[in-house]
Amino acid sequence: MTDPITIKITILQPVHKVWDYFYNPKHIVKWNFPTTNWHCPKAESDFQEGGRFNYRLEYKDKSFGYNFSGYIDEIEVLKYVKSHLDDGRKVEVHFNKIDDNTTEIIEIFEPEIQNSREMQRVGWYAILDRFHKYVEKH
């Protein structure tokens, strides 16, 4: 990876639940957006090595949106997923079981060049924090 950004969060739920909520499209549409003026109207995933994922993120007023999509390169069940986005950037998500009811997620991603590193770190963390709140409430 080239000059990656790393973010992490601790979630008070067991690793198997965190894993399922993170990769199951029926849950992804509920949390995969940075702020309340965004939403994720569509999430598709062929969750296997070589499988494709495609998540649509949009402003609720439909004034702007984009697809977050790519391919899954490697899966170690309940441990990590390595993938690459359509623009070639690499993403890794690690799931560390702290105890039976606590899981740490670490996301490592290559930044794109259009936005500052800090803006990307804040945006990705906002989505990860929304995930954290969602999985702890459901």
Q: What do these predicted ranges mean?
A:
Residues 15-16, 47-49, 73-78, 94-104:
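A short, structured loop/turn motif at beta-sheet edges
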Residues 80-126, 130-131:
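Beta-strand/loop substructures that line and gate deep hydrophobic ligand-binding cavities in soluble
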Residues 134-138:
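Short, highly charged C-terminal tails/helix-capping segments
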Residues 40-84:
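Glycine-rich portal/gate segments that line the openings of hydrophobic small-molecule binding cavities
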Residues 1-39:
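Hydrophobic ligand-binding cavity/cleft-lining segments
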Residues 8-10, 56, 71-73, 84, ...:
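Residue-level recognition of well-ordered beta-strand positions that form the cores
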Residues 6, 65-69, 88-92:
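Short, surface-exposed coil-to-beta transition loops
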Residues 18-19, 28, 53-55, 72, ...:
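Hydrophobic pocket/interface hotspot
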